[in-house]
Amino acid sequence: MPRPSHLNPDDILRFLQVSSDAASANEISRGLHLRKSDQRALFKMLGKLKKRGAIDELSGGRYRLRGRKDEPGAANHGGGPSLRESRSSQAAPPRDGASPTPVRILAEEQSLARDEVRGRLVLHHDGYGFVVPDKPIPELDGDIFIPRVAIEDAMHGDHVVAKIQRRAGYSDRQRAEGRIVRILDRAHASVVGLFRYGPRYNIVLPYDARLQHEIEIPPGEELTPQLREKLIAHDPAFDPKSPHARAKRIPRMEELDGAVVNVQILRFPRSGATPVGRVIEILGRPGELGVDTEIIIRKHHLPYEFPPAVLAEAEKRAQLPSESELADREDFRHLPIVTIDGETARDFDDAVYVERRENGAWHLQVHIADVAHYVRNATPLDQEARLRGTSVYFPDRAVPMLPEALSNGICSLKPQEDRLVMSALIELDPYGNIQSSRLASGVIKSAARMTYTNVNKILENDPEVSAQYAPHVENFRKMKELALLLNARRTEHGSIDFDLPERVIAFDDQQRMTSINRSERNIANRLIEEFMLTANRVVDAYLLHRGIPALHRVHEKPDAKKVLEFEELARAFGYSLGVEDLHRKEISVRHGTIPAAKAGRQQGGKGSRDRGGRSRGGGARSGGSENFGRDREMRVSLAGAEVAITPQHYQRLVKKITGKPEERILSYLMLRSLKQARYAADPLGHFALGFDEYTHFTSPIRRYPDLIIHRILKWALENPDASPRVNSPTVAARHAVPAVARHESRHDAAHLESRRAQTRTPAENFSAPSAPEKSALPQSAGEAVRYTDIQLREIATESSEAERRAAAAERELMDWKTAQFMEQHLGEEFAGLIISIQKFGAFVELAEVFVEGLLPIAAFEEAAGARCTYREFDHSIVAMSAGTTSYRDPYSRSEKSRSTYPSSRGDQSALEPPRKGRGAKPPTQRSWHLGDPVQVRADRIDPIRKRVEFALVEP
């Protein structure tokens, strides 16, 4: 009986995509390393792909992707999956040392069966996984669990179709379960890993533990001709013709054993067959300087090389502005405008200036680099910027969105150099309320390049720094005064200010880490934040007032379930959000007492994941139910229930905990309860800031959405009489509610009534467009653009994904660096604070160095000399000693063990289960809670997760 073929149509499409020319069947067979027995299947599949319109057959029996033109000189490069492909039907072959873009399988748009769900597969390093649905599904409160045996040939990150085999059960532990039935597109066209030499064949072990397939490297694919040329160029010792060659040879395969390599996947796993790939880059050895950064760049598929055409265009565009360009702009060069940035910043994209009027009113100018003048729409430079989406900042280097000729050159607002800008000119009353604003194109000459450190010293009356910048000292004091007023007005409207520090690594001259510290956020940082927030707000208000479709930075109201979970945790510390009827809603939801009619009305409620994945603090439980239908109704009610939560509830709690020992942990938990901010074509408002209108306008050098806003703004200023597209869903939704009503819908009515006479929203301040004449802006094609709603939605989705990708890469490399730093301190003891508790242990944040690590459950058991367990109802770890009795969890129908150890953590009467009568044993049980101080010892580094693990030190 013949063996089943491992041939996959996706493999053929991918091969044709990365090929520099059309390929014959024999070339495809050799490239995919097919068996002779697969030849008939190959021809049959080529015929099917041709019939479906996926490929074209050329003369001579050669094939290529439909709609593609052969461009031998074209090249793709390292980039995120499916972003470039979504923009162009033409696929280019990869450059050397680059991650090719995957091909989307034809079945993507197939209709789904009733029990099928389309989503993204997220695998766990233990083998199982979850499918995160593309769209919230009312019947599913969460993700779909996929057992190891049901993953089939899918890989982590793949876009898949899952067939639901079991619906969610009576508790959160029994979520919906399914299996993978189709793979729509592959997330990884390349994989970075360790090269392992073998006598018969070589393999690459992926660095991402969630990629659970070894990559087989067939003979001849370890060192391709292109890679050999690159090795020779890098080190003449490998050139057989060089007189300096040590051995006049290419290194043997065994010499590559243990090297870090980047592998292009030629054949994905199919019917149990191992995936096959070829080495396209040799990055170095683990532990070598900079190799960890290179690994993270490729692991997260960050575009890491600019194509030659993009670099050439950037050099061509990076010319000093001509007199004709300057003549058509408003001239601000006579004003003492300054930039304020970090110590190591080189891309200065914002500059500010403040005036105090004689009547006490304020005039604020925010000038932003006019990147749209240099990066024109639909050019190679623009396409590359869109692919990248954002600049990525690592501790030791950056991966910029734009080439250096622009980002650190002509677009950077360097001191004493003429620079083109887009300007927001804002008038405020003496109390910091916006009265009017005007947007214009301009030219500035920065008077000084300031740093946050020096501005802060000036504001603290440092005599040396104040003398150095004497001409600007008074202006900085005005900036501080205005910034405090703006912050006060923002606070009145419910803006939440989480002061959570970030990790900052200090290096010596040899790039060795010397410390990991908390970032400082001084008054200089805050004044720039306030000015940028104000500028972003007035730009969005202007575009909304004009009815022009735009990108918005939105932050939606948190889900009811997340609010309830946080409320439960806050009560353990004696705090509450103070939401009316929240406790009654919680009890009703937990016990399934919400009326069926109300539950039915709420089934359309939109569920959402939390802002950064699953919270480390654990989640609130849904009460058990003996009736599946009733429980399903209860779960839907929880996902879609409305809770009257406002930013003021969070803000009031932030004020209560400021300066308290529990501030760090509760601020972290509050942040986790909120949704993740994103880009959208609809003006949904920004919950955390308390704004109805908000966009990103102030960082076009490093964020693609800001560049889009600049183009839209230019179009709006060039066309002051253009009527809004009222048939646009975005515009229609905005115009459906008056501005004042929109504003009031987000704030307490009583509070707004007292402020109405003196406060107006930015949107209300545009009674007439205040813009220069149409001829005042350059008329070059591609500089001013009006986008359609469809285009904006695509860009919003891509930009949000790019932002999350960049954040994940930055976070992971920081974890790697932290692990490397702590390797030097293994065995040392530290004071720490428990900031999160899960079933497998507690996460501890150290006080001396800003490092977070895991205190495993085994460490508690070793310290207590008894078995320890995670107690879910109050998120604690409890030692199951002789003082344990039995109780029934008030939120569950199952028996639990509970502690009779008296609580010293404030009033926990609402959380602690009642004691079991007079028969309770003495309180001999130990427990650990969120916020508890602990003494730990750096014990080991988890080699898979690159995570520090601690041991508990007894006092």
Briefly describe each language-model feature range.
Residues P923-Q925:
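C-terminal structured domains
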Residues R210, D257, N262, R267-S271, ...:
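Electropositive polyanion-binding surfaces
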Residues A98, A732-H735:
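Compositionally biased, low-complexity intrinsically disordered regions
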Residues M1-Q365, A372-E417, R449, N454-L459, ...:
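Charge-lined substrate channels and their catalytic hotspots, especially those that engage the 3′ end
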